[in-house]
Amino acid sequence: MGLVLGLKKQFQKFLVRTFFEGAKKTKATRDFANATNQNFEELAMYDRDMLRARARWLSANNPIMSNIDSTIINNVVGRGISLQSVDDTLQEAWNTWQKSCDLTGRRTLNDMQRLMLQTRMVDGECFIYKKYTKNGFKIQLLEADQLDTYAGKSGLDIDKDGKVTAYYFKTDGDTVKIDAKHIINYHKSNRISQYRGVSEYSRSIIDIKNFQGFTSANIQSLRARANIAYAVEGDDVNPFDYNATDQDGDKIQEINDAFVFYLNAGEKIHTLDSNATPVNYQEFVQSTVRMIATGRNISYELAFRDFSQVNFSSARASILQDNKRFDSEQEHMITYILEDLYKTWYEYEVLNGREAVELPVVSWVVPVREWVRPKEDLSVVLEMVDRNLSTYTDAAKSRGKVFEEILVQRQAEEALIKKYGLNTEEIQNAITKA
């Protein structure tokens, strides 16, 4: 009786294991052979370097991936996410610092913002070293290759609470341990157990490589057919006896400036099909690029700069979704990098050892997002403000401005107009005529 109950329980467990279709082991699911439930870092440590190397190759050699990166960077960072403060002294001090904040003296903070985002997308992560020097507070960008992954846990020290306490970096053959408070590890996490980044190309590497291979094969095929325009054929003839000649008795070498390829010596001539291109090539390109764009979380239209397949409403809907991604990226960079740098800079450069005071509130101005239909979009913004669904501050920020600065500038302009005895209408007419 016990044996029967035992077999029954085993059978019930088997039924439970196979209840979900997605968990069944069949020929169709053989590609899931490497699917396993492990700590993220245990899984990623073996593939991270290879993914990074392949992503760098694609970034340098593939125009589609390069265009996607450039599109994201131009929309997220543009000419730089800038600090705005009503305190002129603070504003001027920050502007001066951000022009010379690079420890290596090669880049401004705006340049570094673009490079940080580019590196994070391709490599998966970027390290920012906050260093205090005799020349003031500086920052240095470090690549993932410089992390000594053989020290600590993949280059990190993690305490019992799961907090990173130190990083290990390679320098001149030695390994240097740097306290975590001096390092910003700029990456995006997809799992709770993740501490380091993985290339954002990881979902698209195979698709883009297959696309390149398919395109290259078709181009080579067409080039070969274009170079061999005619063929001479013959039956039951010695293939080494090339005796096909023209009217002067010379062997035929080319026809209409195209080389002739001899299959066998003979007299029958026909043209090869130089237009043998797969009829579904365009569909293949579009579907592949859509898949790549989806893997990069961006619309096909923006990734391929192709709006010919959609109407205005569909294009606008795609742009709105892309803008949400850009908004998220901007918030991520401001929260994890710029606010951290601002706080550290203020404590070191402004306070300079003096008693700490409350950190002055500042605004971060993102690149101007151009309107698709300026008049209609402006009307919508003004109506939202009138209906208390938005504010002038938010409206100004969306145009890369600070509302208070606009008011100050407007006040100065009004005073200038009054000084010269003019009115607003005359100024507008003068600008229109100019």
Language-model segment annotations:
Residues 2-5, 267-278, 282, 315-326, ...:
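Activation/maturation switch segments at domain boundaries
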Residues 80, 97, 101, 208, ...:
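Generic structural signal for hydrophobic core residues of well-folded globular domains
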Residues 90, 94, 285, 289, ...:
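Short amphipathic alpha-helical coiled-coil/interface segments
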